[in-house]
């Protein structure tokens, strides 16, 4: 990411997938700041993450306020609960009430909500806070550049497969012109960074990832892959029932030789297992 020339990033739910120590290391390695207004706590670099950051570009002062989604129950982002133990999260929409004062600062030309909430969350921000000029979003992996009554929204897909070129004219703190362009980074006509390609290939060329560990005679759907995955766990752990969240299974088992890279594609998180005794009457599905 340092090689992409980022100026700033928001913390998203998957930043926590490998634990707080790893995330703290990644933040310290980054040559750009992370922001997130609706969480607190943590150690190391996590304790230093700012709520917002002001960046000056070509004479324009831009305030970036960060926010991450807090899951279906509003308690923590969609990651393993153990990975966010000791951290405290607040409502990512309501937290923007605390930052209205930023728009009153005459030195700020543009207020940007840099979010990992998904499309519906970004829409709520523009519906509720007219001081936000632009929402740069993520999480739901959409691709769009839209104008709403109170501001603008953009999102650029996932995994850096695409970027958004957004061109705006600003006059007296107001966006007077907005143009949005999608740039597909898989386009073969784009110039490639050869040194970066070599670095990526270095990680991909680990022989242990491609060692044969099995064979599948058919292609599996996601549901079938889930059945295979949970049945394998049941056999190894020797239990009666295995419960696995569907979002934790990220790929399908395909026909052919099975290698560790296939398994990591199916289960990239390495969340571990909890084994416990429960009665049928206590099990509520």
Cite the ranges covered by each PLM segment:
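Acidic, metal/ion-coordinating pockets
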Residues: 1-189, 195, 222-232, 242
């Amino acid at each position: 990411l340092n090689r992409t020339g980022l100026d700033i990033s928001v913390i998203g739910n998957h930043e926590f997938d490998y634990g707080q120590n790893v995330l703290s290391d990644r933040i310290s390695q980054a040559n750009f700041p992370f922001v997130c207004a609706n969480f607190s706590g943590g150690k190391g670099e996590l304790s230093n993450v700012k709520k917002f950051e002001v960046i000056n570009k070509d004479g324009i002062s831009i305030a970036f306020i960060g926010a991450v989604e807090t899951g279906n129950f509003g308690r923590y982002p969609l990651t393993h609960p153990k990975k966010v133990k000791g951290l405290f999260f607040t409502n990512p929409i309501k937290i923007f009430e605390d930052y209205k004062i930023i728009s009153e600062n005459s030195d700020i030309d543009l207020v940007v909500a840099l979010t990992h909430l998904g499309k519906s969350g970004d829409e709520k921000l523009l519906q509720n806070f007219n001081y936000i000029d632009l929402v740069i979003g993520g999480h739901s992996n959409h691709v769009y550049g839209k104008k709403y009554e109170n501001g603008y929204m953009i999102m650029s897909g996932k995994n850096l497969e695409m970027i958004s070129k957004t061109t705006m004219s600003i006059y007296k703190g107001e966006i007077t012109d907005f143009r949005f362009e999608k740039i597909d980074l898989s386009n073969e006509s784009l110039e490639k960074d050869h040194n970066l390609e070599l670095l990526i290939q270095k990680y991909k060329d680990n022989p242990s990832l491609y060692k044969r560990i099995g064979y599948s005679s058919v292609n599996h759907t996601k549901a079938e892959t889930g059945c295979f995955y949970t049945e394998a766990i049941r056999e190894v752990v020797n239990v009666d029932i295995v419960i696995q969240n569907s979002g934790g299974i990220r790929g399908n088992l395909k026909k052919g030789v099975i290698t560790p890279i296939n398994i990591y594609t199916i289960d990239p998180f390495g969340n571990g297992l909890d084994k416990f005794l429960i009665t049928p009457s206590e099990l509520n599905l």
